[in-house]
Amino acid sequence: DEMRSNLAFVADFDHFNENAYFGLNDYKGNENALAMNLMYNHYFTYRSSLIVGAQAQLQYYRESLANNTPWIEAAKSRFYDFDRSEQEVGAYAEYTYAVKDKFSIVAGIRGDYNAFYDKFFVTPRGHIRWNITPSTTLRGSAGLGYRSTNVITDNIGILATGREIVIPDFDGFNRLEKALTVGGSLTQTFGLVSADDATLSFDYFRTQFYNSVIADQEMYADKIMLYNSDKRSYTDTYQIDFSWTPVERLDIFATFRYTNSEM
């Protein structure tokens, strides 16, 4: 195979508009987002390559929520203005090393400056794959990430509850979530009727939140509290997948998932 270097530029524009009415709850949301990505891919050898790039994102949100619950005694009519504009620029690098179909490792890092939060973020990530045998594959990955939440659209179902929606500290509300995800999977291919016609895989991932946005529906019977928390919070996810193709054009799938969360 020929080793080549590539230079690419990608621009993407997204427009989203939503008007939702749940009884006396009126939500209006509008988003315009522009993303530009300049990427250079260089092959050192057939086994190793490096991707470097720069990225810029412009996001304009126009959001509002009128929360009226006159049937709840002493409840206030609330109006929330979530308008904001986010500008973010950053750079990234990703190194890949592979030994044919036997082993591969990917290590990446990126740094981004977000003008809305006036913060610089560093987010490392890594992925490893090892084909232990032709029919057994082990994968592992880890990565740190940040996410600017849209608290109403992320929890749109709360508008249908008829309850008062309260953000206790609206001016100090931190919508930026930070989390670390670590996990892996083990996949085994085997034969039941014919060779390699079945696959069994086991996945485990843990997400540790360092700041999370919570829609608390348990604190009060007539209110939903929206707030951010930097307390211990995590999610453990276990999943088993089974697939089998006993005959051509017939596929059988079965999945079991167990999730354990603490907030």
Model-derived features with residue positions:
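Structural signature of Gram-negative outer-membrane beta-barrels, strongest in the C-terminal barrel
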Residues: 47-49, 82-207, 260
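Gram-negative outer-membrane beta-barrel transporters
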Residues: 98-101, 200-208, 228-263
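Aromatic-acidic/polar surface patches that form glycan- and anion
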Residues: 29, 84, 175, 231-232
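Outer-membrane beta-barrel translocator domains and adjoining extracellular loop/strand segments
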Residues: 10-12, 19-26, 63-71, 117-124, ...
